[in-house]
């Protein structure tokens, strides 16, 4: 899958030659991005490269990179834990470039990835979890047709204030995706 939107953003599969540029994203993670995704603020470059390259060959995942119009990596969209027998998988997305937040880029990437999951992989169910203190992501997932199906209460800590937050479980079924399109 290679998709380009009207603004020139591209969503495409991760390639081995992307590993170093991808690793640079994790040299110093924006505190707000780390807060909303549960990430650390810093990762070892070699470990990120190894992880990235291993994921490319992993048959239970499909990793996509989100590039801005200058071809700079600004995020990723991942279908993981693909279970071919159950036709189910887990989904996650992260926009690392905070200047790209709130512009609809994430919603577009979610839509493209969800379409790929059902159309190309042939999934029956795609699930995700999102922190209760990430309302922008919750709205984007609901806009894409995901339905809330459960809550893990006080399962995470909001690094902004030290308070507990909920981990919201969401999913979309193939029939819901077809109706939503």
Regions found by a protein language model. Give the residues of each.
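Conserved active-site alpha-helix within GNAT-family acetyltransferase domains
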Residues: 107, 132-150
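Acetyl-CoA-dependent GNAT
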Residues: 41-99, 173-175
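Conserved catalytic-core motifs of GNAT/GCN5-like acyltransferases
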Residues: 127-130, 147-163
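Active-site acidic-Proline motif in GNAT/NAT acetyltransferases
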Residues: 97-99, 103, 132-133
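Conserved acetyl-CoA pyrophosphate-binding loop and the N-cap/start of the following alpha-helix
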Residues: 100, 104-113
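Conserved GNAT acetyl-CoA-binding A-motif
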Residues: 119-129
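A short, well-structured alpha-helix characteristic of acyl/acetyltransferase catalytic modules
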Residues: 1-49, 175-181
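Short hydrophobic/aromatic beta-strand or adjacent loop that forms the aromatic wall/cage
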Residues: 61, 165-169
């Amino acid at each position: 899958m290679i998709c380009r939107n009207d603004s020139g953003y591209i969503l495409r599969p991760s390639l081995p030659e992307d590993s170093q540029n991808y690793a640079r994203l994790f040299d110093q993670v924006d505190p707000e991005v780390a807060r909303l995704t549960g990430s650390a603020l810093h990762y070892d470059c070699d470990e990120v490269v190894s992880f990235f390259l291993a994921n490319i060959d992993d048959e239970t995942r499909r990793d996509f990179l989100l590039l801005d119009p200058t071809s700079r990596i600004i995020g990723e969209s991942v279908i993981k834990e693909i279970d071919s027998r159950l036709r189910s998988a887990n989904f996650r997305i992260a926009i690392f470039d905070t200047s790209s937040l709130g512009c609809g880029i994430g919603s577009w990437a979610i839509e493209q990835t969800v379409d790929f999951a059902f159309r190309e992989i042939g999934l029956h169910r795609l699930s995700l979890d999102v922190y209760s203190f990430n309302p922008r992501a919750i709205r984007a997932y609901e806009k894409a047709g995901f339905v809330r199906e459960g809550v893990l209460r006080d399962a995470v800590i909001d690094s902004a204030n030290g308070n507990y937050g909920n981990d919201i479980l969401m999913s979309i079924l193939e029939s819901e995706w077809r109706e939503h399109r």
